[in-house]
């Protein structure tokens, strides 16, 4: 009877280990960066696999795009600024 309980416990523990996805994340990206060999997901978490590395954009890329958009000059702004000048 004791042996059967031990076998059942071992089987349950083994199944629990098998259910853990090896590509599960290890935490949040810090300033858009992750430990070596890991990718930053579009939601800001580090991990391996297509859920994290599948898309080309990373948090760093997104931040660079936002910064570039904020600093880009709108061509219509220049026309409006010079509209009242001779």
UniProtKB/Swiss-Prot annotation:
Protein role: Chitin-binding protein with a defensive function against numerous chitin containing fungal pathogens. It is also a potent inhibitor of Gram-positive bacteria.
Record-annotated disulphide pairs: 29-40, 34-46, 39-53
Chain residues in the propeptide: 56-86
Organism of derivation: Amaranthus caudatus
Signal sequence region: 1-25
Keyword Metal-binding included in the entry's annotation: no
Keyword Metal-binding found: no
Additional notes on this entry: Its chitin-binding activity is strongly inhibited by divalent cations.
Protein's recorded name: Antimicrobial peptide 2
Chitin-binding type-1 domain sequence ranges: 29-53
GO annotation (BP), single: killing of cells of another organism
Record's subunit section: Homodimer.
